[in-house]
Amino acid sequence: EIWIIPSVGCLNIVESAIEKRAQAYLAGSIDSILAFSHPYGCSQMGEDQENTRRILADLINHPNAGGVLVLGLGCENSNIDVLKEYIGEYDESRVKFLVCQESEDEIQDGLELVKELTKYAGAFTREPIPCSELIIGMKCGGSDGLSGITANPAVGAFSDLLIANGGTTILTEVPEMFGAETLLMNRCENEELFEQTVKLINDFKNYFTSHNQTIYENPSPGNKKGGISSLEDKSLGCTQKSGSAPVRGVLSYGEPVAVHGLNLLSAP
């Protein structure tokens, strides 16, 4: 896959145009060309800006991308020079940068860079890898009254199997842990992780209350129509995705995984 990642939302139209032209020109020579549109990268401050930069850097460094084209506008807060500080060391053959304000034809220049990336990624060969190299994020959606006794436990069984073979899984959707959080706290590998999990839960609860929002009004009309009676009901289903493995890591938003096994991630 070739990924096109803009540093700022102003470039979504340019990014989309490069993607469409590359799809037409390079059809059949690469698995896919994906454009990651977003509305961020400028007029942000503090933690909001920090999160955007970390997530963009994480996408650029993501192992699922054979090659990455990073588009910058040139005048944005999270410009390419800033992003490079978050990216760290990178392979110049795998990651290409284009500052659009410095280009007379950014769409054509972008296409040429995608061609270079496609040639680079085309030299790769598929090969088996051990389970220990797999990191899988777990997600549920459209939950109903049966999710907690069908699909979610099946995901939990998969998580346990992967972890037993040295792999890693990530559980998030923290507001959907409310009411069932003690099930995860009791499985923390040590006291430090226990305290981090308590903070993970309480930080989200405090965020809700600081904005005068009711914590336990999470279930959607679709959830209720499907048979979910309360947030605790929904949360008991959500936590089933974690299986029975011990909690070995607690991650902040955008933080890379550092340990194998079950990790909890701070995200909505």
Give short role names for the model-derived ranges.
Residues 1-268:
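Metallocofactor- and cofactor-centric catalytic cores in central/energy metabolism, strongly enriched
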